[in-house]
Structure formats: C-alpha cells, structure tokens
C-alpha cells in the first residue's frame, strides 16, 4: 500500500520475560522464525489525514495477503500490547492513535444486551476472546472496533485508554494492525535471536525473522542517486585526465629516440674514391 511507509526494524532492546524484545517500526512485517505462528504489521500514520477507515484498513491488509487483526486469546493480546509498547518508545515520534482490529458488527441500531454477541471477526475466526473497555461496546451506529492507544490521555473509568477495545463508527480514521499466515521459506530472511512469548506459550525463547528488508532498501538507495552520479562523473573525469597524460608521455618518448645521435665517430675512409 502506497501510504504505508516500509521501514527496517531497529536494534534489539533489553527486556524481561513476557516482553516483545525489539523496537517495532511502523509498516514492518514481524514474523516468528519457526514459521508456525502468524506474522504481524503495525501500520501507524503520524499525519491524521493519512489514517484510514475500517474498510480501507481491511482492504489494505488483504491486498498484501493478510487480514485485519483477529485475536484468539489473551496471550496473543499481550503479544500485540508488547509490540505496541516497543512501537512507542521515546524518540520514535509515535504517540496517540487507536488501531483498527478485525472485529465488527453486521447490523444496524442494536442497543439491547445481546449487542455484544453480534460482533464477529472479519477474517472468519470463531474466537470468542474479547477485551472491551468499561461500558463498551456502546453499539448504536458504532459497529467497528479499535484497540485503544491513547498513552497521553487521562485515565477514564476503566483506567488508561491503552490496548482495551472500543467500538467506533466504521468511517472514522485510525491506524490498523494486519495479521498474516506464517511465512513458508521466505525470500532472503534475516534472522536475529531474542526473547519473546509466542501466542499461547509462556517464557519461551524464539527467533524472529525480519521480513521485507530488500524492498525497503529502495528508500535508502533512491535519495543517494544524485550523489552517486556526481561521484561517477568525478571519477570518470579523473580517469580521463590520467589517461590523457599517459598518452602524452607515450608519444614524447619515440620522438626523443629518433633525435638521438651517436657520439661515436664514423669511419668514412672506406668510402673515399
């Protein structure tokens, strides 16, 4: 997707058990190296005008072979929370901004107690896991679900507006999280070991693969093209001058040899008549 900037993962971070021990960068797909667990991508937009609706987020994930995030259990919820915590480390420029997940309600105007049961996952998952904020879902015209991410907001009745879920109008503009099937034999993966928890596991060492690094080099190479051209021109000019001087010396040497006169006295007596 053109509006998602693909960036490389940052350096590994030190952390304790249960934390996702790596700086997570917006637009970077993160995969487990055992290729048995899902991959994820956090799509964060600093500019509010670049954020997307629920349907746009859903289509963006599907266009890359993924789905809008579904959560199977609390372990997977905690994993996503850890990734978001590393996404918002000081200095990254990432702050407030909720994230679309794939939960939504197909129906209009339900406000009864049965409303929470009408929510379903857009990828077809049968997971019944929910992590609603206090007094949510509010139903009515709010049919699509976000994961709260408001670290600078004052706590509400249910505590800080972090990681719990809230239903919102589907045309509102937010960030989003994609989920992908485990990658099989990915192209040129770069593996770096560090500690993390897999969904459903506890305190286990895992190697995570950084996917999509080669395409991201485009963002590094393109800005350097003018400099590379300048260096190439300077190098070519230098080589031309050296070659020209070398040819000048080569031409001078034979001319000098033709003007050389022997100091020996020629014997011409034999030529007298």
From Swiss-Prot:
* C-type lectin domain span: 35-179
Q: Where in the cell is it found?
A: Cytoplasm; Membrane
PTM description: N-glycosylated.
Q: Which residues cross the membrane?
A: 217-237
Q: List the disulfide bonds.
A: 61-178, 144-170
Give the SUPFAM superfamilies listed for this entry.
Answer: C-type lectin-like
Describe its function.
May play a role in the development of the nervous system such as in neurite outgrowth and elongation. May be involved in motor axon growth and guidance.
Q: What's this protein's name? A: Chondrolectin
Q: Which organism is it from?
A: Homo sapiens
């Amino acid at each position: 997707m053109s509006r998602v900037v693909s960036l490389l993962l940052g350096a590994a971070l030190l952390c304790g058990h249960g934390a996702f021990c790596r700086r997570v960068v917006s637009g970077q797909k993160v995969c487990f190296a055992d290729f048995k667990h899902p991959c994820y991508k956090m799509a964060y937009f600093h500019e509010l005008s670049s954020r997307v609706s629920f349907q746009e987020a859903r289509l963006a994930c599907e266009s890359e072979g993924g789905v809008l995030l579904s959560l199977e259990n609390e372990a997977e919820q905690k994993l996503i929370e850890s990734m978001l915590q590393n996404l918002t480390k000081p200095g990254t420029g990432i702050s407030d901004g909720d994230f679309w997940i794939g939960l939504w309600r197909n129906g209009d105007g339900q406000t009864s107690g049965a409303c929470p049961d009408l929510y379903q996952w857009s990828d077809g998952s049968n997971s019944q896991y929910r992590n609603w904020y206090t007094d949510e879902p509010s139903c009515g015209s709010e049919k699509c679900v976000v994961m709260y991410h408001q670290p600078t907001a004052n706590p509400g009745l249910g505590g800080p507006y972090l990681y719990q879920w809230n239903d919102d109008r589907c045309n509102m503009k937010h960030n989003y999280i994609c989920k992908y099937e485990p990658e099989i034999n990915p192209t040129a993966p770069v593996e770096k070991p560090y500690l993390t928890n897999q969904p459903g596991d506890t305190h286990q060492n895992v190697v995570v693969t950084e996917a999509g690094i080669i395409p991201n080099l485009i963002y590094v190479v393109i800005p350097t093209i003018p400099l590379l051209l300048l260096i190439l021109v300077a190098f070519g000019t230098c080589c031309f001058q050296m070659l020209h001087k070398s040819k000048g010396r080569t031409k001078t040497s034979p001319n000098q040899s033709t003007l050389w006169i022997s100091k020996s006295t020629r014997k011409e007596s034999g030529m007298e008549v």
